[in-house]
Regions:
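C-terminal and inter-domain tail/linker signature
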Residues: 1-148
Length: 148
């Protein structure tokens, strides 16, 4: 697989909630950087992703791979779904929010995913006002200290 195909396969697994398979595509020192209190490792990212899917069973990431530049694959994401389960983000210091049945849809953000030796080492979600996890929390009425 080329880098673009590797990222597309990974993003497809995340979209389907196939987190065990997605995990197998991440290096042990994988890091996610985005609109969260601090960068997180593979284990914490997987827990957060599983918890997001549990809180939003219809979660759609609207992933789109848009290009490559060396080891970096550029993509976009635009989250939407309905909050029908508990959103437990205690593993990233954001507490737990009971189901609200509120539908959310956030703005598109750009991401950069680094691939080395057919494995994903880094996922950077560039901050955009009204996008990502911060925007979801705002739409749910959750007060946080996160910057958008």
């Amino acid at each position: 697989m080329n880098k673009r195909e590797t990222v597309q396969t990974f993003l497809d697994a995340v979209q389907k909630g196939e987190f065990e398979f997605a995990s197998s595509m991440l290096t042990d020192n994988f890091e996610f950087r985005g609109p969260i209190p601090e960068p997180i490792n593979k284990k914490t990212w997987l827990e957060m992703s599983v918890n997001l899917k549990a809180a939003f069973p219809d979660l759609n990431y609207h992933f789109k791979v848009i290009g490559t530049d060396g080891d970096i694959v550029r993509s976009t994401t635009q989250l939407s779904g309905t909050h029908t389960g508990t959103l437990d983000l205690s593993n990233i210091s954001l507490g737990s929010t009971p189901a609200t049945n509120i539908p959310v849809s956030v703005k598109m953000s750009k991401t950069r995913i680094t691939v080395k030796n057919d494995m994903i080492t880094l996922w950077v979600d560039d901050p955009v006002d009204g996008a990502g996890l911060t925007a979801i929390l705002v739409q749910l009425g959750v007060k946080t200290q996160l910057k958008m």
